[in-house]
Regions:
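Glycine-rich phosphate-binding loop
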Residues: 91
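Conserved GNAT acetyl-CoA-binding A-motif
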Residues: 102
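Acetyl-CoA-dependent GNAT
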Residues: 5-9, 16-86, 94-99
Length: 102
């Protein structure tokens, strides 16, 4: 696994990681209506572009797949941290947090 900075072409994979993480990893703790509100299936790419624009975003990749991503502001405060469920509990979030801390 490797970390790198987000590029605009990564947006579809980042959106998919977010959606899948919310609907899989958070599913035991929230009602479906809450999950759909938090991560709607018809999320708009333009809204995501606006959301990420003021932030620094990094990715962890594994064999060309986005395993997770983190977005943080200029003060280093995390705003978003999500891991693809296929890579859960494999140290992805730890790697991303270490990048942000350094």
């Amino acid at each position: 696994m490797t970390e790198r900075k987000f590029e605009p072409g990564d947006l579809p994979q980042v959106m998919a990681v977010y959606h899948d993480a919310v609907h899989t990893l958070a599913a035991p703790f929230y009602a479906k209506e809450q999950l759909d509100s938090w991560a709607p299936p018809d999320a708009k790419m333009d809204r995501w572009k606006e959301r990420l624009a003021p932030l620094q975003t990094i990715l962890t990749e594994h064999e060309g797949l986005v395993a997770g991503f983190a977005s943080y502001n200029t003060a280093g405060h995390l705003d978003l941290l999500f891991v693809d469920p296929r890579f859960a509990r494999r140290g992805v979030a730890t790697r991303l947090c270490s990048w942000v801390e350094n």
